[in-house]
Amino acid sequence: MKVLWAVLAFAFLTGCRADVEPQLEPEVREPPKWQAGQPWELALGRFWDYLRWVQTLSDQVQEELLSSQVTQELTVLMEETMKEVKAYKAELEEQLGPMKEETQARLSKELQAAQARLGADMEDVRTRLAQYRSEVHTMLGQSTEELRARLSSHLRKMRKRLLRDAEDLQKRLAVYRAGVQEGAERGVSAIRERLGPLMEQGRLRANTVSALAVQPLQERAQAWGERLRGRLQEVGSQARDRLDEVREQVEEVRAKVEEQATQMRLQAEAFQARLQSWFEPLVKDVQRQWAELVEKVQAAVGTSAAPVSSENH
């Protein structure tokens, strides 16, 4: 009996523990990589890859999210995508033959709806990132882990929605193109002649779009180079100004030294003249007295020499 009660108690406790354990969040599978072929698909692929990079929420991403850099980049990519979609639709309507107006109106309406959904979802991504930036600025240095978690979850869901929108738009474009081709009563040779330029235009547009993708990086590098060149010119100008200032100071010092040297030379000449005026009379007086003394000695010697000579004779 005790064993039975023990088994029942264990089962009861196990069931309670199972009830209070939190339900794990289901693992979200990464959507497959977007397959691109047409120019609008390539443009959407760049938007997709950029959004994948933003979703990593790396240090660089978080730093650029605090500014308007990310939203500006997304705006450019979004505008390029919608522009390419409109251009591709216009090319289909221009290059391929007519169809029934009723069918064309229906397909065009469905295509516009799919295009609008894609644009709205891309706009939602940009709005959500702008909202995240505003919320981070409001936190004033507090922890933003919860905000980043919500943003990551939202971006993951938005990427799924964008993938569904893109696939739906891709299918409707294919249907639209097929409907146009079915309505056009042309031979295989005529289709080949018409589609050849269209495919060439698509290839050229794809190359142009790929070049435009590199253009922002080139513009950034050129802007950085211009800023560096401007800074170097500014430093060089400051150095030249400082050198000119030092040169002027040296010239001023040299002029002052020359002026002082001239004054000292003039003072020395004046002092020399003054000394000469002082000692010249004294020198002349000494010379005169010396000459008189010599004359007296010579006279005395001559007088004493004369009697001695006479005595010898």
Swiss-Prot record:
Which positions does the entry assign to sequence repeats? 76-97, 98-119, 120-141, 142-163, 164-185, 186-207, 208-229, 230-251
Gene Ontology cellular-component annotations:
chylomicron; extracellular exosome; extracellular matrix; extracellular space; high-density lipoprotein particle; intermediate-density lipoprotein particle; low-density lipoprotein particle; multivesicular body, internal vesicle
Q: Which residues carry this modification: Methionine sulfoxide?
A: M139
Question: Which superkingdom?
Answer: Eukaryota
- State one molecular function term (GO): identical protein binding
Q: Which SUPFAM superfamilies match?
A: Apolipoprotein A-I (SSF58113)
Which stretches of sequence are listed as region 8 X 22 AA approximate tandem repeats? 76-251
Q: Which residues carry this modification: Phosphoserine?
A: S143
Q: Does the keyword Phosphoprotein apply?
A: yes
Q: In terms of one coarse class, where is the protein primarily found? A: secreted
Record keywords: Chylomicron, Endosome, Extracellular matrix, Glycoprotein, HDL, Heparin-binding, Lipid transport, Lipid-binding, Oxidation, Phosphoprotein, Repeat, Secreted, Signal, Transport, VLDL
Question: Where in this protein does the record put region Specificity for association with VLDL?
Answer: 274-286
Q: What does this protein do?
A: APOE is an apolipoprotein, a protein associating with lipid particles, that mainly functions in lipoprotein-mediated lipid transport between organs via the plasma and interstitial fluids. APOE is a core component of plasma lipoproteins and is involved in their production, conversion and clearance. Apolipoproteins are amphipathic molecules that interact both with lipids of the lipoprotein particle core and the aqueous environment of the plasma.
The identity of this protein, by name, is Apolipoprotein E
